């Protein structure tokens, strides 16, 4: 892919300002994690969830195959999630995704390229050393919704107060 998305620091600053103003009756916890392209799967985010919790993932960044040629992979196809060291692994079809946690534990993030998943738990057979050749990375915003909150409605309300590259509204639309 080619192009110039929002910078990772700008994304973190803008989304952080929006989420910092949210009441705890909507969002139980939010955090940001830097997932560098050179990091093999799986990175523990420290966000603890219970089975059944709803989590929204919001992504910004680029993973470069060739930075000089500006050839990069969009985070929507690069970043995968799982909970507690077990599958199912999943990702969204865009730079946002909301999922219901199948397990209790911490949310983990995995870079896909250059790996190929061999099972639903996210094991790889690729040499983890190959990740050292990748550059760039993804800033990942994680939102753990309070029990009983409708993420689509909450995301619409957040987007009305301020959005980052229309990511919050796009996820609300996807959920509806």
Segment roles from a protein language model:
Residues 3-176:
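Gly-Asp-aromatic-enriched flexible segments
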């Amino acid at each position: 892919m080619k192009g110039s998305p929002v910078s990772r620091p700008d994304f973190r600053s803008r989304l952080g300002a929006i989420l910092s103003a949210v009441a705890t009756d909507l969002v139980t916890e939010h955090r940001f994690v830097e997932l560098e392209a050179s990091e093999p799967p799986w990175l523990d985010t420290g966000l603890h969830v219970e089975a059944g919790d709803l989590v929204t993932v919001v992504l910004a960044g680029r993973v470069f195959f060739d930075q000089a040629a500006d050839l990069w992979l969009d985070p929507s196809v690069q970043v995968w999630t799982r909970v507690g060291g077990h599958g199912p692994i999943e990702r969204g079809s865009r730079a946002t995704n909301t999922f219901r946690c199948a397990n209790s534990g911490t949310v983990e993030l995995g870079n896909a390229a250059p790996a190929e998943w061999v099972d639903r738990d996210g094991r790889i057979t690729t040499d983890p050393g190959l990740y050292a050749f990748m550059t760039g990375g993804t800033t990942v915003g994680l939102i753990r919704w309070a029990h009983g909150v409708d993420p689509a409605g909450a995301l619409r309300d957040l987007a009305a107060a301020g959005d980052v590259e229309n990511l919050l509204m796009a996820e609300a639309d996807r959920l509806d």
